[in-house]
Amino acid sequence: MSKKTERQLSSAATQRAAFSFTRRTLLRTAAATAALAAGPAFIKRGFASSGEVNVYAWSDYVWPEQIKSFEKATGIKVNLSKYGSNDEVLTKLKASKGKGFDIIFPSVDTGPTWYQSGDLLQPIDESKVNVDMILPTLWKKSKKLGGVFRRKRYLVPHDWGTEAMIYDSSQRDYKYGTLSYSDLWSEENKGLVTVRQKSSFMGIGLYLDRIGEVPSNRMLDTYKDEASMRAVWDKLLVFAIEHKKWVRQFWNNTQDTLNAFYQNNAVIGQCWDGPSLRMMKETDGKLRYLMPVEGGLGWLDTMAIPSGAANVENAYAFINHLLTPKMGGIFANNSGYNSAVVGANEYLESDSKKVFAEAYPEDAIDRLWWWAPQPAWWSAARAQYVDKLNAA
């Protein structure tokens, strides 16, 4: 990749423009295209009607109901493998040179890292994807967030979500508008916190920028170049190491998060919305998920076809199966994340709608901080800071 292209992908301007994503925009685009969902769900004709498809997905992304209905409709067997992080799937596909799987689910901001890591993904043939079933806002904005490279699309929106604050409301009384990432590091929460190392740096950075202690233009300056990033992250590392004793358990996947609260008695954490909203439902609101004053961390996950996929047509068939309202609803109700499919909200259960409204009150969606496209140098540097925190 040329230096110019890399700068374009990682610039602060790209991050600011990429997601003018608000509650109003989401509702408006969903309503404007909901009529598309009224017709029968379908899988585009012309795909193979037998064989298999090898799916490599996040642990809580593909559900038995989705697999069963797909296999019944197509005769194609789904072989599902699961991973827990973007680093895990990238490492595996690097080692196999893009072979072994037909569909993966990368976060859109990791697109630049994929493109700079070799020929690991193949361009998407948009004529084979039911693009009309994807919320137009997400389809359009995913282009600027990392889904398109050199005028070719590689990443198809699947879902969006957040990483923000979850806490035990029987022991803490936080409110929207005052809850902050800084509450993780209050004296009363010492030894009771769960965070993911690499994203905890972002929460710390947004907090320290807000109070003027470590100015970073809401962390956007860290995407300009490596020197600018390290100037900020060096200071964040000092804070993180000084407060490492506050952490009861680090998490890296959904199961880790569930264990932190259900088994290891964490009281507060910075966690994904999926497991957090699931726990919110399962505990009748005892565990609560809420956006901090600095803004929750917004992300968009996608579907991609590796360069060495053996069952490409079956991969497109499975992608289109997931891009139906009913399948989007099944995903959202089970995972706690938000489907990118037009009409999926019509299949949301009442408790899913309830916890969503409580997690994102007032202007919470408008205030989200969206992960910017991550060039390879940024991801590599972040990994170094995580290693230093782990070793401290």
Predicted regions: what is each one?
Residues 19-25, 36-51:
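N-terminal twin-arginine translocation
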Residues 108-111, 116-248, 252-256:
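Extracytoplasmic ligand-binding site segments that recognize negatively charged/polar headgroups
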Residues 259, 362-392:
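Conserved C-terminal helix/tail region of periplasmic/extracytoplasmic solute-binding proteins
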Residues 110-113, 270-285:
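A ligand-binding cleft/hinge motif common to bilobed small-molecule-binding domains
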Residues 234, 238-243, 273, 283-304:
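Periplasmic-binding protein-like
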Residues 47, 301, 306-367:
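Mature extracytoplasmic/periplasmic domains
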Residues 47-114:
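Early extracytoplasmic/lumenal segment of secretory-pathway proteins
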Residues 1-21, 34:
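N-terminal secretory signal peptides
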